[in-house]
Amino acid sequence: MLSTSSSRPFKSKFRAAFWPIYNYELGKFIPMSALMFCILFNQNILRILKDSILISEISAEIAGFAKVYCVTPAAALFVIIYAKMINHLTFEKIFYYLTAFFIGFFVLFAFVIYPNIHIFHVHPDYLADWMERYPHFKWYISLIGNWGYIVYYSLAELWPNIFYVLLFWQFANELTTTEEAKRFYTLFSLFGNSSLILVGFLMMNLSSKETIVKHFINISDSKITLVQISTILVTIVAVICCLLIRFISRNVFTNPLFYAKAKSGRSTSERMGIIKSFKYIVKSKYLWLLLICSAAFGFAINLVEAVWKAKIKELYPTVNTYAEFNSLYILWTGVAIMVMTIIGNNVMRMHNWFVAAVISPVIIMVTGVLFFVLIVFDQKILSLFDGAILMSPLALAVSIGGIQNILAKGTKYSIWDTSREMLYIPLDQELKTKGKAAVDVISAKVGKSSSGLVQSIIFTIIPTATFTSISPVLMVVFTFVCLAWIYAVRKIYFEYQKIA
């Protein structure tokens, strides 16, 4: 009897640490985990494709311009449209309409625009002539001349913030209580982000010369085939997402066991108009701090990624080789996220919210500064370790940048994302929906576009500048932004304690 009773606390602690889900909760937990898996599956295929196409077909420098002048205006427009949609449509219909729009364009690009890019784009010689005539405006000319790549990149950039950050987490926050969130959210992250490993293996094969696809079809252009097969996969998984949304809406939201409001129905209180809604949001100090945190991540990581991706293109210049390397990076990012999720789950249980939330900015700042130091002082560092480093300076820069990004994304997509979502749960319905839409969609793009704006101003003023030459300036800006992020996390923790 003694051994049996003493084993119960051990089993209880083990379950609390690794599987804090009760059997009756599986009807809610499993479909939500599957939905997150599918959304992230598509997100990471699109991430590999958008960078491989844009950077290989044009350049790494153009990405900053695209984020400032295309992605951010599109994100702002979406928030306005979404605020209108949420007043007139159910969440289920909004999800279907947005999915149809995005998938429709991706299919159009893969099967019509990309294979016939010479028809839709300005001739490269004509474009090069105009860029040579007006060097200070060459990147703006390139944006217009390569519009197909830019629109694809912009929509692929918006996918994570619309479908994952906004729609999935809004769905989860509505369905999940604060107590459940502490147990569910890290496991959502664990199962959902395992899709990165699958995507990594899958895309490595599709982008390689020895792809399994060549045993079934004749490949005339490997990059076109890569994009088309990937788009078919994205379309199939998007349909599965819609079916999961339908299942959860019909079976989980209507079950009082899973959703407390099912007995009385969802809130039917009158919603605010757009202008009144945004005035309400602007007055919220809480949302402003959330916006700073989200924008700081986008700003900081984009500074590091911009330099790193320029180095990747030097080492892997074609669409397929770039995609193959990107797939390997995504795979290891998935592994890092799963490890960090397990760590984060226990950190969140054993410590307060601030300890868990501050891990991401600290790791990103430390690893980012190390990467910039390597880029800025590469020759001096290599001379210090003469003969000890068995790779070229370029390969070393790509490898260190990859490690930095894997650790940064690993902590962000596991510990920080789950910590951030807990901040929305105590808020009222208006801030949970429209407030979340404004923060999640706009803030990340404001961060990336602000970073892109810094880069675009430099490249416009100095047409001969490269990412390597401006790295010292970017390193200083990067450090300042990370410190601001840490400060905002501390301030919002005090606000969270007041309402939680």
From Swiss-Prot:
Pfam families in the cross-refs: TLC (PF03219)
Annotated keywords: ATP-binding, Cell membrane, Membrane, Nucleotide-binding, Transmembrane, Transmembrane helix, Transport
Membrane-spanning residues: 21-41, 62-82, 94-114, 149-169, 184-204, 224-244, 287-307, 328-348, 357-377, 381-401, 469-489
Keyword presence, Membrane: yes
Membrane association type: Multi-pass membrane protein
Keyword set includes Membrane: yes
Gene Ontology molecular-function annotations: ATP binding; ATP:ADP antiporter activity
Compartments it resides in: Cell membrane
InterPro entries: ADP_ATP_car_bac_type
One Gene Ontology CC term in the entry: plasma membrane
Superkingdom to which the source organism belongs: Bacteria
Family: Belongs to the ADP/ATP translocase tlc family.
Function: Provides the rickettsial cell with host ATP in exchange for rickettsial ADP. This is an obligate exchange system. This energy acquiring activity is an important component of rickettsial parasitism.
Name of the protein: ADP,ATP carrier protein 5
Gene source species: Rickettsia bellii (strain RML369-C)
Gene name as annotated: tlcE
